């Protein structure tokens, strides 16, 4: 194993028995041959479970929607990319020449995906408990800074954070109708989310309120919230 990968292992706090697993986790799809997408898929599932389980234990009084919002914040691409930068992960990625020239080693989505792939690789190389220990160790500061007060955000913010955690496009809001007299108007808004086949709708005495109602409806349609949170 090269000295550089040895340094990365020290930063991660884990030494791979199978070096090929580590290399595969660091291989972007732009690189020739096999890539890290399958390991990323596995790592994403493990990450969501481990974080969800930890939140369930840490906040016994939290409602489902609150737990979902906290988890979305911890597993979103921005958080994972920040951790990856702390490991200097971009220095170890295997990228195709085009991606390399365009600065792919700094791109948030590539860094976040690679970290998820490393989680999947650690699970494959060791076991679930080892993967859990690494995830919780990496996220110690993030967990320590969490409170249920953090979940008191408006629906538009919660929807945006959820979509960002899934590396999805941000929602689009459109005023489709305005009814009533100028002093007593009702705004009708549609919210388009790429994960939903149908636009969610909201109405209110202002555009802002109508957008919040539409965002809340989208969160329910996505299964993130149940309407009672």
Swiss-Prot record:
Intracellular or extracellular location(s): Cytoplasm
Every RNase III domain range: 5-127
Enzyme Commission designation: 3.1.26.3
Essential cofactor(s): Mg(2+)
InterPro entries, sorted: dsRBD_dom, RNase_III, RNase_III_dom, RNase_III_sf
Record-annotated active site: 44, 116
EC primary class: hydrolase
Catalysed reactions, semicolon-separated: Endonucleolytic cleavage to 5'-phosphomonoester
Keywords on record: Cytoplasm, Endonuclease, Hydrolase, Magnesium, Metal-binding, mRNA processing, Nuclease, RNA-binding, rRNA processing, rRNA-binding, tRNA processing
Coarse class of the protein's main subcellular location: cytoplasm
Binding residues for Mg(2+): 40, 113, 116
Gene Ontology, cellular component aspect: cytoplasm
GO biological processes: mRNA processing; rRNA processing; tRNA processing
Gene3D superfamilies: 3.30.160.20, Ribonuclease III domain (1.10.1520.10)
PANTHER family named among the record's database cross-references: DICER-RELATED (PTHR14950), ENDORIBONUCLEASE DICER (PTHR14950:SF37)
Complexes and interactors: Homodimer.
Main function: Digests double-stranded RNA. Involved in the processing of primary rRNA transcript to yield the immediate precursors to the large and small rRNAs (23S and 16S). Processes some mRNAs, and tRNAs when they are encoded in the rRNA operon. Processes pre-crRNA and tracrRNA of type II CRISPR loci if present in the organism.
Family, per entry: Belongs to the ribonuclease III family.
Protein name: Ribonuclease 3
Organism this protein belongs to: Pseudomonas entomophila (strain L48)
């Amino acid at each position: 194993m090269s000295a550089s990968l040895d340094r990365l292992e020290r930063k991660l706090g884990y030494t791979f028995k199978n070096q090929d697993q580590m290399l595969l986790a660091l291989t972007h799809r732009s690189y020739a041959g096999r890539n890290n997408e399958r390991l990323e898929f596995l790592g994403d599932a493990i990450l969501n479970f481990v974080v969800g389980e930890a939140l369930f234990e840490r906040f016994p009084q939290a409602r489902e929607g609150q737990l979902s919002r906290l988890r979305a914040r911890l597993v979103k691409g921005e958080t994972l990319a920040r951790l990856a930068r702390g490991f200097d992960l971009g220095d170890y990625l295997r990228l195709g020449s085009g991606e390399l020239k365009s600065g792919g080693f700094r791109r948030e989505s590539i860094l976040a995906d690679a970290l998820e792939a490393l989680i999947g690789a650690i699970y494959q190389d060791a076991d679930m408990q080892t993967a859990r220990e690494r995830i919780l160790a990496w996220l110690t500061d993030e967990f320590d800074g969490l409170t249920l007060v953090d979940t008191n955000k408006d629906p538009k913010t919660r929807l945006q954070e959820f979509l960002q955690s899934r590396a999805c496009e941000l929602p689009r809001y459109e005023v489709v109708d305005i009814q009533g007299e100028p002093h007593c108007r009702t705004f009708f808004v549609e919210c388009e989310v790429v994960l939903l086949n149908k636009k969610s709708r909201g109405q209110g005495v202002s555009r802002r309120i109508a957008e919040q109602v539409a965002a809340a409806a989208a969160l329910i349609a996505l299964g993130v919230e149940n309407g009672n949170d």
